[in-house]
Amino acid sequence: MRLFLSLPVLVVALLTILEGPGPAQGAPEAVDTSTGLDKLKEFGNTLEDKVREFFNRVKESDIPAKTRNWFSETLQKVKEKLRIES
């Protein structure tokens, strides 16, 4: 009885193994991989360009100078208030 049950199970297991990988498990094609890498590289280059443009725009703008002046003025006001109260 054991041989009668184990033989079909063995045949099914061998057929499954010899069938090979299914479509979802197959190795990705080289074209798909290179296309994916090209898209990733393009995304990286685009991101790099946008970040460089952002930092250049910040360097050229007067925002850092205004911020520095605002902090300096606020610090001076706080120091003056502390001197008056002391």
Curated annotation (Swiss-Prot):
Q: Does the keyword Ubl conjugation apply?
A: no
Q: Which Gene3D superfamilies match?
A: Apolipoprotein C-I
Q: Which domain of life is it from?
A: Eukaryota
Q: Which GO terms describe its cellular component?
A: high-density lipoprotein particle; very-low-density lipoprotein particle
Q: Which UniProt keywords apply?
A: Lipid transport, Secreted, Signal, Transport, VLDL
Checking Pfam families in the record gives: ApoC-I (PF04691)
GO molecular function list = fatty acid binding; phospholipase inhibitor activity
Q: What does the entry give for GO biological process?
A: lipid transport; lipoprotein metabolic process; negative regulation of cholesterol transport; negative regulation of lipid catabolic process; negative regulation of very-low-density lipoprotein particle clearance; triglyceride metabolic process; very-low-density lipoprotein particle clearance
- Tell me where the signal peptide lies: 1-26
Q: Where in the cell is it found?
A: Secreted
Q: Looking at the keywords, is Secreted present?
A: yes
Additional note from the record:
Apolipoprotein C-I is present in acidic (APOC1A) and basic (APOC1B) forms in P.paniscus, P.abelii and P.troglodytes and perhaps also in baboons and macaques. The two genes for ApoC-I arose through a duplication process that occurred after the divergence of New World monkeys from the human lineage. In human, the acidic form has become a pseudogene sometime between the divergence of bonobos and chimpanzees from the human lineage and the appearance of the Denisovans. Pseudogenization resulted when the codon for the penultimate amino acid in the signal sequence was changed to a stop codon.
Task: Write out the function statement from the record.
Answer: Inhibitor of lipoprotein binding to the low density lipoprotein (LDL) receptor, LDL receptor-related protein, and very low density lipoprotein (VLDL) receptor. Associates with high density lipoproteins (HDL) and the triacylglycerol-rich lipoproteins in the plasma and makes up about 10% of the protein of the VLDL and 2% of that of HDL. Appears to interfere directly with fatty acid uptake and is also the major plasma inhibitor of cholesteryl ester transfer protein (CETP). Binds free fatty acids and reduces their intracellular esterification.
Q: Which family does it belong to?
A: Belongs to the apolipoprotein C1 family.
State the protein's name. Answer: Apolipoprotein C-I
Organism encoding this protein: Plecturocebus moloch
Source taxonomy: Eukaryota, Metazoa, Chordata, Craniata, Vertebrata
Gene this chain is encoded by = APOC1
